[in-house]
From Swiss-Prot:
Name of the featured protein: Sulfate adenylyltransferase subunit 2
Organism field: Rhodopseudomonas palustris (strain BisB18)
Database matches in InterPro entries: PAPS_reduct_dom, Rossmann-like_a/b/a_fold, SO4_adenylTrfase_ssu, Sulfate_adenylyltrnsfr_sub2
Lineage: Bacteria, Pseudomonadati, Pseudomonadota, Alphaproteobacteria, Hyphomicrobiales
Pathway(s) per entry: Sulfur metabolism; hydrogen sulfide biosynthesis; sulfite from sulfate: step 1/3
NCBIfam families assigned: CysD (TIGR02039), PRK05253.1 (NF003587), PRK12563.1 (NF009214)
Source domain of life: Bacteria
Transmembrane stretches, start-end: none
Function recorded in the entry: With CysN forms the ATP sulfurylase (ATPS) that catalyzes the adenylation of sulfate producing adenosine 5'-phosphosulfate (APS) and diphosphate, the first enzymatic step in sulfur assimilation pathway. APS synthesis involves the formation of a high-energy phosphoric-sulfuric acid anhydride bond driven by GTP hydrolysis by CysN coupled to ATP hydrolysis by CysD.
Its EC number(s): 2.7.7.4
């Protein structure tokens, strides 16, 4: 395994497209009226959060939705910077390219980024291989997020979740109320009429806000193309070392991944439709190296955007249950 990782690192540039390569291929186009309406709604929501809450924060998970959300936030408050910090809950198992991209974007934009790692999880050595996906996700993501929100006293957390991603998210409000214990009750949601939002909170309560609620996966990709938004190169097809495990193509991103008997990493042309912790995120065979090709693949697909997320397969890990416990 070490040999193939060393080989990949040594020749990484020609295998995976760089941000400069990708930007050079993107032709700027005018946004459609549909995208303009979505953009206007999202910017209105972001400004509403800044006006109504004492200490908001924006979750930055480095994926395509977070990249669109960050771009919208920069637009909403231009020529100034967003009046709230960004927060990344780092599980320590993200793809290396994701962390490199995160740090590069923060340097380019000069933004305030808070990176939180659950110290209890680190002390216990919690990881997806040693403890399983369910416990890893709960400790390093859900509990880590709650720790960060409480430590900094944030009363509103902005995220990039969309209603078309998953059925429990489809029924969640744009302004989603959370109890003092960060719990979401799907049976106790507030009405949202037109663009009027109830932002009132009792002491200790908080709000999760989703400005991209009404966007679809296609909308996100169209907007990325039109606005030339930088995204992690992992979304584009390239030769990457993968093993087939439990029906998923798992990328061997570093030497921490233990190989099972008979497993040998193979370089295959793959990309990722969604991003998370690398041991829990399956790749898809692909030759799509442009945004147009990605959209074509997506339109031809009959599978869920989150099909590669191993955490969604846990019998006790439904999205609604995780959200009720404080997951974003």
């Amino acid at each position: 395994m070490t040999d193939i990782l060393d080989e990949l690192d040594a020749g990484r540039a020609p295998l995976a497209p760089t941000l400069a390569d990708l930007r050079g291929d993107w032709a700027r186009a005018e946004p459609s009226a549909h995208l303009q309406r979505l953009e206007s709604e999202s910017i209105h929501i972001l400004r509403e959060v800044a006006a109504e809450f004492a200490k908001p924060v924006m979750l930055y998970s480095i994926g395509k939705d977070s990249s669109v959300l960050l771009h919208l936030a920069m637009k909403a408050f231009a020529p100034g910077k967003p009046p709230f910090p960004l927060l990344h809950v780092d599980t320590t198992w993200k793809f290396r390219e994701m962390i490199e991209f995160r740090d590069q974007r923060m340097r380019e934009l000069g933004l305030d980024l808070i990176v939180h790692i659950n110290p209890d999880g680190v002390a216990q050595g919690i990881g997806p291989f040693s403890h399983g996906s369910a416990l890893h996700t709960d400790v390093m993501k859900t509990q880590g997020l709650r720790q960060a929100l409480e430590a900094h006293g944030f009363d509103a957390a902005i995220g990039g979740a969309r209603r078309d991603e998953e059925k429990s998210r489809a029924k969640e409000r744009i302004f989603s109320h959370r109890s003092a214990a960060h719990r979401w009750d799907p049976k106790n949601q507030r009405p949202e009429l037109w663009s009027l939002y109830n932002t009132l909170l009792a002491p200790g309560e908080s709000m999760r806000v989703f400005p991209l609620s009404n966007w679809t996966e296609r909308d996100v990709w169209d907007y990325i193309l039109v606005e030339q938004i930088p995204i992690v190169p992992l979304y584009f097809a390239a030769l990457r070392p993968v093993v087939e495990r439990d029906g998923a193509l798992i990328m061997v991103d570093d030497a921490r991944m233990p190989l099972r008997p008979g497993e040998v990493p193979q370089l295959r042309s793959v990309r990722f439709r969604t991003l998370g912790c690398y041991p829990l995120t399956g790749a898809m065979p692909s030759t799509a190296t442009t945004l147009e090709q990605i959209v074509d693949e997506m339109l031809a697909s009959r599978s869920s955007e989150r099909q590669g997320r191993v955490i969604d397969r846990d019998s006790t890990g439904s999205m609604e249950r995780k959200k009720a416990e404080g997951y974003f």
